[in-house]
Amino acid sequence: MDSDDDMHDMDSVDYDYYSGGTYDDNDSDETDFGFGEADTDDAAIIASYRSKSNYVVLKEEDIRRHQNDDVGRVSAVLSITDVEASTLLLHYHWSVSKVNDEWFADEERVRRTVGILEGPVVTTPDGREFTCGICFDSYTLEEIVSVSCGHPFCATCWTGYISTTINDGPGCLMLKCPDPSCPAAIGRDMIDKLASKEDKEKYYRYFLRSYVEVNREMKWCPAPGCEHAIDFAGGTESYDVSCLCSHSFCWNCTEEAHRPVDCDTVGKWILKNSAESENMNWILANSKPCPKCKRPIEKNHGCMHMTCTPPCKFEFCWLCLNAWTEHGERTGGFYACNRYEAAKQEGLYDEAERRREMAKNSLERYTHYYERWASNQVSRQKAMGDLQKMQSEKLGKLSDIQCTPESQLKFIAEAWLQIIECRRVLKWTYAYGYYLQDHAKKPFFEYLQGEAESGLERLHKCVEKDIEVFELAEGPSEEFNHFRTKLTGLTSITKTFFENLVKALENGLADVDSQAASSKPANSKPSSKTKGGGKGKGSSKNGGSSRNPDGN
């Protein structure tokens, strides 16, 4: 455990984690908390709280509007129908500039490649009856349907063909004429005309999703059931985004938001949490293989006399793994094994014991970090539930009791949102700590982590416990304004501290390196004098560090 002196030294490291945040009980109550006046919806509040200029959350109607705008632009510039423009954009992955460049470079080649034909490729036979190219039945002209190529098929076969391809998946967006040798594209007009209502919904679902899935700057929100997309502009170091559904995730890897940990570390941590490797570590640390059948056996009683499970039933000594029949008073009796102790002194069991001890230590270390990682996740989920309960049940009552409009109580929601965000950050600091290889940085990291936990607990207590006296009051209290100032102050300080903590961890705790580097001249002074046998001109110049605690 770190001494008090160590803690003081770490606290003196030249990094202002509290810069920008002040707490004063006498601060003015006229504070703008950054929320709208009327919108109390959870999603809107979270979106407002986490909104950043480097991304935009798109609803389905927004995506559809973007699609229609692109289709209209291509249609106007190339003087083609909207259906043909849609077909071109699908082929060129919704790139308007690519469509224009390719079209004006070689229109004929583009038409041939995409399947937008200028005229029929087959001659319509004279007569009142036509033969369907799929079922080969005869139909009148009114019952025959064809696209730009002119191949005749009956409406029933067309419907079946379209339905089959739509139910096969997104490939239906590149649908071609049923004739195997024909490249003619089938556009949205045929879907509207011949597909069933259910098939139309599926087709346009694929059509909508194609706009996002081919765009490198857009991704769907990975939350189950969410139908929003994120348009990410970049330009910042953070990939964390928040959807209107309140789900926060990393735009780069689509895992949950995980600052200050990088995506590679998150991938390793998640894999470790779900992999069988930890089960094997537990088995290795807490069991030994049966000397006869080699199955792992856990020792669950105090006696060293072990009996393997049927059908093996081999009896052996837990310490030396030899047959129990060889044990008696000469080997130490039932609860000790002189043979094992002697062999251990000779080094015969050192390797196996060392492996088992290493596995046990590794498991204990992993368990330490995982339990705290998971605990903060549970606390975060509970805080989200408490926020929802506060907004749906308690806020109105508190407004009535304190005679304060709900629009002036948004500071409470802001505090809860800060707690939710801090729990997320604190949770991932444990994954950061697990993979932190530089042992010199560990004490400072754990100090910062401890300070973060302490500050967060103060904020959590204030918004969860201290508010109860005002919720249970019979009328307005003069102390409520003091509570408002206290809570907003704690929220601001906690936010600033966690923001600086994230930056410090993302920079690899560079301040520890800089502190070590700046202390090297002072530390090297004694050795310089020893080597030189006295104060030379150079040693005198280098020895006058202001960081020397003796002041020499």
UniProtKB/Swiss-Prot annotation:
Residues annotated as binding Zn(2+) 1 are C132, C135, C154, C157
Q: Which residues form the active site?
A: C303
* Binding, Zn(2+) 2: C149, H151, C177, C182
Q: Which residue ranges does the record annotate as region Disordered?
A: 513-552
Q: Which residues bind Zn(2+) 5?
A: C290, C293, C308, C312
- In residue numbers, the region (TRIAD supradomain) covers 128-341
Q: Which residues are noted in the entry as Zn(2+) 6-binding?
A: C317, C320, H327, C337
Pathway membership, UniProt: Protein modification; protein ubiquitination
Domain note: Members of the RBR family are atypical E3 ligases. They interact with the E2 conjugating enzyme UBE2L3 and function like HECT-type E3 enzymes: they bind E2s via the first RING-type zinc finger, but require an obligate trans-thiolation step during the ubiquitin transfer, requiring a conserved active site Cys residue in the second RING-type zinc finger. The active site probably forms a thioester intermediate with ubiquitin taken from the active-site cysteine of the E2 before ultimately transferring it to a Lys residue on the substrate.
Q: What is this protein called?
A: Probable E3 ubiquitin-protein ligase ARI5
The UniProt keyword set, sorted, is: Metal-binding, Repeat, Transferase, Ubl conjugation pathway, Zinc, Zinc-finger
- Compositionally biased, Low complexity: which spans? 514-530
EC class, as a word, reads: transferase
What reaction does this enzyme carry out catalytically? [E2 ubiquitin-conjugating enzyme]-S-ubiquitinyl-L-cysteine + [acceptor protein]-L-lysine = [E2 ubiquitin-conjugating enzyme]-L-cysteine + [acceptor protein]-N(6)-ubiquitinyl-L-lysine
Its needed co-factors are: Zn(2+)
GO MF annotations, alphabetized: ubiquitin-protein transferase activity; zinc ion binding
Q: Where are the zinc fingers (IBR-type)?
A: 201-263
Which family is this protein grouped under?
Answer: Belongs to the RBR family. Ariadne subfamily.
Please list the residues that bind Zn(2+) 3: C221, C226, C243, C245
